[in-house]
């Protein structure tokens, strides 16, 4: 049995809860992406964690492949009226849970702390306020196996809600360039998990906190890729045309 322990079951201050869009509309999955992840792990059973899972279809599809999947979502709107409500009806409080991802939490499986082979979060990180990012990444590091992979995409364009009840809301609360992101990720205990067989295209950017020039960096029409392990397979959460940065990371040794 899987259970979640937290004092913050809902991200009540998040613009994505107050003025929901993705948490209600999104229930995206991608079989090519799942296949690429499975191939990377030699098609063995893996433990997968999806942060900002919305309707939970990605996790439902991993589970249907025989994997152990958990999805975490910040807003109850996904469960109550989202596009993936049927997944929440089936997997809610078993594989899908709500939690404020910017606060401490711990997942357990049969009362043992869970560790995951693969943690993924697409177009979610930029929704976390800058002052909460270190706690956000600390939870990921705590739940990642020592040889696990953390994969994310981060949008670099603004997304403003506007004025709601006298307060200006901004969905994308952390919009930085690749230099700031990679320095922050290294400072939070991650390093690139690149595939040496993937030919990089150097982008000529300096990363002061990184020892030497990062390897496995490529510039493509969709955006900048850092250590990306899955070739052309990208989870189709959003259509991106140079608007995102993609990272595949592992724990820093």
Give, region by region, the residue ranges found by the protein language model.
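Short N-terminal helix/helix-N-cap motif within the alpha/beta-hydrolase-1
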Residues: 129-133, 161-162
């Amino acid at each position: 049995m899987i259970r979640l322990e937290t004092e913050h079951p809902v991200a009540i201050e998040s613009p994505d809860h107050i003025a929901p869009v993705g948490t209600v509309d999104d229930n995206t999955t991608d079989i090519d992406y799942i296949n690429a992840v499975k191939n990377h792990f030699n098609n063995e059973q893996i433990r997968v964690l999806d942060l900002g899972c919305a309707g939970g279809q990605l996790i439902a599809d991993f589970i249907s492949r025989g994997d152990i999947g958990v999805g975490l979502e910040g807003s109850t709107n996904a469960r109550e009226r989202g596009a993936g409500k049927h997944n929440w009806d089936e997997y809610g409080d078993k594989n899908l849970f709500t939690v404020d991802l910017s606060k401490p939490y711990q997942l357990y499986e049969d009362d043992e702390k869970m560790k995951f082979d693969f943690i993924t979060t697409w177009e979610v990180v930029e929704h976390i306020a800058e002052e909460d990012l270190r706690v956000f990444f600390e939870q990921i590091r705590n739940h990642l196996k020592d040889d696990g992979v953390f994969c994310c995409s981060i949008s670099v364009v603004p997304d403003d809600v506007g004025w709601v009840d006298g307060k200006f809301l901004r969905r994308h609360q952390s919009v930085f360039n690749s230099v700031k992101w990679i320095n922050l990720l290294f400072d939070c205990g991650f390093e690139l998990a690149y595939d040496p067989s993937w030919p990089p295209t150097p982008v000529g950017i300096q990363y002061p906190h990184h020892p030497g020039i990062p390897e496995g960096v490529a510039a493509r029409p969709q955006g900048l890729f850092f250590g990306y392990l899955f070739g052309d397979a990208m989870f189709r959460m959003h259509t991106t045309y140079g608007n995102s940065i993609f990272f595949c990371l592992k724990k820093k040794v």
